[in-house]
Amino acid sequence: FITNGGCVENSTLGSQNEVAPFNTEIKPGGGWDMWRKIAAQDPAFGNPNKFCYNPELSNWMSATVTTLDDRIPPYVQKICKRDPFSGKVVTGGIVTVKDSNWLLSWTFNRQPQFRSQPKGQLVGWIYGLFSDKPGNYIKKAMRDCTGKEICMEWLYHLGVPENQIEDMAENSANTIPCMMPYITAFFMPRSAGDRPLVVPEGSVNFAFLGQFAETKRDTIFTTEYSIRTAMEAVYTLLNIDRGVPEVWGSVYDIRDLLNATVQLRDGKSI
C-alpha cells in the first residue's frame, strides 16, 4: 500500500527569531521521489511531475502562536465575539483578512488546545497563501519572516496600536513558523491519468493511497478522501465483500445546489 506524493514533504520549522527555510529540493527516499520512480515504469502509475514541478505555485506558510499573557486575547475576543477562555467554540472556523497582502487567515479552536497547556494561555493557528508578497506592516515576504515578524503582521491586522505591536509580538507571544513547499500540490492543474487509480488495472499486489490517488466523485483536501482510497485499496486487494461508503450526492440535490448559490453570494439576492 503506497502513499504516493506528499503535501507536507520538505516542510520546515523556524522559531520566534528564526526563519523557516524554503527547502524545495526533492531528495531520494521521499514520497515524490518514490512516485517518480514508480511512474517511470508505466503511464498507468500517474504523472507526479504535474504536482511537484513548481513549489512557487504550491507553497504556503503557517505559524502557531501561543499567547503568554492577557494582552492579546482581548483583540481576539473583540473580533470573534466569544470569550476564548470559555472552553467553548472561539472563532468557529477561520478568520480571513481579505485586504492582507499575504491573504492572512487565523483561527483559535476550543481551548485548551493541549492538555498540558498552561492556564491563561491560548494556542492559535495563522497561515498566509502568498508567501512571496511583502506584508502590509512588515515590508518583507512572509517566507523571509521570523515567527515574531509574522506575529507582528497578524497583530497589525487585529487592530493592535502600532506603537505596541513589536513589544507584544516579542513578549506576549511565542510564534513558530512552518514553510510547506508542496502543501497545495494536489490543487495543481491536472489531466485524466495524472493521478493513478487506487488499484491500477492489472495490479494484484499493490495499491495507491491518499490525496494523489484517483477515486470517483470525491474531492481532495479532506481526511475522508484519504480514508476512502484506503478502504477501496484494502477491500479490492484482499477481496473483502464490503462497499466503500458513497460520497454524499450533493451535486444531484437541488436543495444543496441552491444553498451553495446563496452561500457563494454571502446571502445577497441575485
Label the model's feature ranges.
Residues 253-270:
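Acidic, Ser/Thr-rich low-complexity intrinsically disordered segments
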Residues 2, 9-252:
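C-terminal segments that line or cap access tunnels to active or ligand-binding sites in enzymes
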